[in-house]
Amino acid sequence: MELGLFLMPLHRPDSFHADTYDQDLNLMEVADDLGYTESWIGEHFTMPWENMPSPELFVARALGVTSRMKFGIGVSLLHMHHPAHVALRIAQLDHLARGRLYFGIGSGSGTEWNKEIFGVDTAREDIHSQMMEAVSVIQQFWAGKPFHHKGTFYDTGIPEPKGDTLFDYHMIPFQKPHPPIAVAGSSPSSGIPVS
């Protein structure tokens, strides 16, 4: 039997953040020693009980206190990030993890705070279409070949090499073709169809 963890994480809002991260890292170390096979770390920007705005940073640190456990980003809210940034960060993290990484995506919960702080309406009806477009663009970046994508939400891509060896797109994942992708969903309409 395999055991895993899902860390929101939950901490009292009046807790000192540095201490809560140390507690969570200690939990990762103990779980790894006990044989837990994976841990998923949530992404939460505006929830005082769940102080984890960058699960990638936490996972990068947790990799140093574990040796076997795999980590999942649970989940990256793609509508809150540009797909090029996500592709680069997750590919780099996959190298740091040497393949001990899962990439989770989801729409999250729409809060007024996210809308007011980031200017992103997470309750819009086309949020799932944006997620589908974003994951497609991320996978194109991970392929590492020149492409241009002009879609409903994004106009981006990898340009053709210009003969300059100083600048070029180079960050493809450690795992081939990319880290396993998990899609979160709490209802039939909250996930996205992916293959």
Residue locations for each model-derived region?
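Alpha-helix N-cap and loop-to-helix initiation/capping positions
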Residues: 16-23, 50-54, 81, 85, ...
